[in-house]
C-alpha cells in the first residue's frame, strides 16, 4: 500500500485518460478501484484536505497531494472526479474546479440540482471545460430509466422504491441522538406496495406505505433505551413518517453483522397503450448493490470517459446523465458497439 509519494509527477506519456480524485473517503477509494478496471484510464493523483503523508492509497503510480496544490495539475489531468458530500462540499467545489478541469460529481440533493447545474455551467464555460453533475444511481441510472420509461409510456405512473440498504444520512441521524454510541439504518421497500405496482394496480401510495425503516443501535453505557427509541421514531424528516423498528445490539454485533454499505432499489413505470388503453405494461429497472459507494464510483468513472470525449470534441459547460449519448460511456468504438451490443 502506497503512502508517501507526494506531488510533483510529470504528465505521463501514455495515451490513457488521466484521472484525478478529489477527496479520499469511501467514494474516492471506490473510484480508485474502478479506474483499475478500465484499461483506457490511469489514476495520476489524489487530492486531500488532510496531510498527504497520512493518506494511504493503493495505486503505486499515483501521487497524493494537498488540495492547495491542485492548480499545478491543470495540464496533467484529463478529468477530475470530485468525491465530496452534497450538503456542503460539492456546491462549492464543483464550480471552482470546473474552471480548471473537466469534472464529474455525484451531487444528490434533488431539489437543488437546477441551481447546482447553473453554477457549474457558468464555471465550466468560463474555463472551457465539461462538467457532468449528479452522476450515480439516484440521481443517475434511476433518472435515466425514469426518462426512458416516461418517453415510451406517456400515459402512466412512476414509482421508485429504495432498498433494502443502508441509508448513510439516516444512520448519521441515529448517531446524533443522545445516548447512542453507534448505529446503522436500513431502508426497506414494503413488499405489498411493490407487488401492487408490479401487478399494474397503479396504487396511490403514501410515504409510510412505500418504505419501512429498521435501525440497529448501540447504546452508550447507562443510556435510556426507551427514550432513545422514542426520539428516533419521532424524528421529523427522517423517521416520523415511517413505520420504524429499533433493535438494540452490542458494538460487536454491529461490527460483525452490519459493517457493509449495501443498497439498491427499483424504478417502475406502469402505463397503458392501445386506442382504448386496453393493454397494460410495466417497465422495471432494479439494482442490488453490495457496496453503494463502489457502485456509485463505477458510474462516475464511466461518465468521466464521456466528459473526456466531449472535451476532445470542443464542447464545454455542464451536462447531466440526460445529455450524454450512451456510446460516450463506452471504451469501445461505434463499430464495436454495433457488432457486439446492439
Feature roles, as predicted:
Residues 18, 30, 37-70, 166-304:
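C-terminal substrate-binding/catalytic lobe of Rossmann-fold NAD(P)-dependent oxidoreductases
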Residues 24:
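Glycine-rich Rossmann-fold phosphate-binding loop(s) that bind the pyrophosphate
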Residues 27:
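Hydrophobic/small residue at the entry helix of a nucleotide-binding pocket
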Residues 72-73, 87-106:
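Rossmann-fold NAD(P) dinucleotide-binding segment
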Residues 79-82, 104:
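N-terminal Rossmann-like NAD(P) cofactor-binding module of classical short-chain dehydrogenase/reductase
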Residues 107-131:
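Rossmann-fold NAD(P)-binding glycine/threonine-rich loop
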Residues 141-157, 172-182, 306:
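Oxidoreductase and adenylate-handling cofactor-binding alpha/beta cores
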Residues 281-342:
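NAD(P)-dependent Rossmann-like dehydrogenase/reductase catalytic/cofactor-binding core
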Amino acid at each position: 500500500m502506497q503512502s508517501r509519494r507526494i506531488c510533483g509527477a510529470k504528465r505521463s506519456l501514455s495515451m490513457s485518460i488521466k484521472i484525478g480524485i478529489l477527496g479520499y473517503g469511501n467514494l474516492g477509494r471506490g473510484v480508485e478501484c474502478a479506474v483499475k478496471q478500465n484499461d483506457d484510464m490511469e489514476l495520476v493523483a489524489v487530492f486531500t484536505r488532510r496531510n498527504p503523508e497520512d493518506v494511504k492509497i493503493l495505486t503505486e503510480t499515483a501521487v497524493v497531494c494537498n488540495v492547495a496544490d491542485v492548480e499545478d495539475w491543470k495540464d496533467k489531468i484529463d478529468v477530475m472526479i470530485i468525491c465530496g458530500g452534497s450538503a456542503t462540499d460539492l456546491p462549492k467545489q464543483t464550480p471552482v474546479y470546473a474552471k480548471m478541469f473537466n469534472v464529474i460529481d455525484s451531487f444528490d440533493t434533488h431539489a437543488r440540482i437546477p441551481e447546482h447545474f447553473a453554477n457549474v455551467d457558468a464555471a465550466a464555460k468560463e474555463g472551457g471545460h465539461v462538467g457532468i453533475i449528479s452522476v450515480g444511481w439516484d440521481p443517475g441510472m434511476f433518472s435515466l430509466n425514469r426518462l426512458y420509461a416516461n418517453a415510451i409510456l406517456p400515459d402512466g405512473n412512476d414509482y421508485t422504491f429504495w432498498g433494502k440498504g443502508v441509508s448513510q444520512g439516516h444512520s448519521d441521524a441515529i448517531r446524533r441522538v443522545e445516548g447512542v454510541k453507534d448505529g446503522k439504518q436500513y431502508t426497506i421497500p414494503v413488499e405489498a406496495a411493490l407487488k401492487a405496482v408490479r401487478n399494474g394496480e397503479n396504487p396511490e401510495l403514501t410515504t409510510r406505505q412505500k418504505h419501512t425503516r429498521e435501525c440497529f443501535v448501540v447504546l452508550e453505557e447507562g443510556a435510556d433505551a426507551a427514550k432513545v427509541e422514542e426520539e428516533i421514531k419521532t424524528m421529523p424528516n427522517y423517521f416520523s413518517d415511517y413505520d420504524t423498528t429499533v433493535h438494540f445490539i452490542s458494538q460487536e454485533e454491529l461490527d460483525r453483522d452490519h459493517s457493509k454499505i449495501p443498497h439498491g432499489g427499483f424504478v417502475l413505470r406502469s402505463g397503458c397503450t392501445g386506442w382504448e388503453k386496453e393493454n397494460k405494461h410495466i417497465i422495471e429497472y432494479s439494482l442490488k448493490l453490495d457496496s453503494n459507494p463502489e457502485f456509485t464510483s463505477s458510474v462516475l468513472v464511466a461518465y468521466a470517459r464521456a466528459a473526456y470525449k466531449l472535451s476532445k470534441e470542443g464542447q464545454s459547460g455542464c451536462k447531466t446523465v440526460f445529455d450524454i449519448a450512451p456510446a460516450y460511456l463506452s471504451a469501445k468504438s461505434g463499430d464495436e458497439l454495433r457488432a457486439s451490443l446492439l
